[in-house]
Amino acid sequence: RLLAEDGTVNMVLFDTGVVPIGVYDKEGVPGPDAGFWWYGFWPDDIRYIMKTCKDTGAGASISVFEPGWMKNVVAMAKAGTIPRGSKLNIYFASEKLAVCAPPTREALDFYLSMIDGLDLKWAVGYMGPESVMDTPLARLSLEHGGSFRVGLEDWPNGTSNVDQIKRAKEIIASVGREVITGADAIKYLDIPFPATRPKA
């Protein structure tokens, strides 16, 4: 909130639910030794972020890890409470992680059917041992009017961010889409105010 009030950022993180995240052990059970934790926002956290966006004019980067989270997005969209300038990040995961849907056309189609008719910007993200660009999701998202996430946050053992962006640009160009950055991206997302730099 402090960064949004200062104008340093113009988007804030917005998770729409809580989900258990785990890594499967040799018996096919998530955690605990292999890793298991709860992630997300509880209802009071959601209301706090909604109020922060309303008070500051910040947009929101809205995470969707499970279908129930997308139901929450739809409910907020119908209630008119999704912050202006928001974008959905629909996450998928490899078979090694006990969370999210697999990176398939059918899974993406299911999520998109839930938001059919709603004016929502969206992207796909992928957590796994390879890049989202090594799955069908990257191209499918572009063909369906969305976008995809790249970077070391989702693929920590991958190539550099610069190399991932170069590859992403090639995929985007191959389907006839354009890359937008800076002010154009802010306009595309309809974020109420431009990003600023911290005061010197």
State the predicted function of each range.
Residues 1-4:
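Hydrophobic/aromatic-rich structural module bridging two neighboring secondary-structure elements via a short loop
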Residues 7:
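Extended ligand-binding groove/face enriched in aromatic
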Residues 10-151:
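Catalytic alpha/beta core domains of metabolic enzymes, predominantly
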Residues 22-24, 29-33, 158-177:
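C-terminal helical cap(s) of enzyme catalytic domains, especially alpha/beta-barrels
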Residues 72, 159-161, 191-192:
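Short Asp/Glu-rich motifs
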Residues 109, 139, 143, 162-170, ...:
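A generic structural signal for well-ordered alpha-helical surface patches
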Residues 141, 153-156, 172:
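Soluble catalytic regions of large protease machineries
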Residues 166, 170-200:
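Mid-to-C-terminal alpha-helical segments outside catalytic/metal-binding sites
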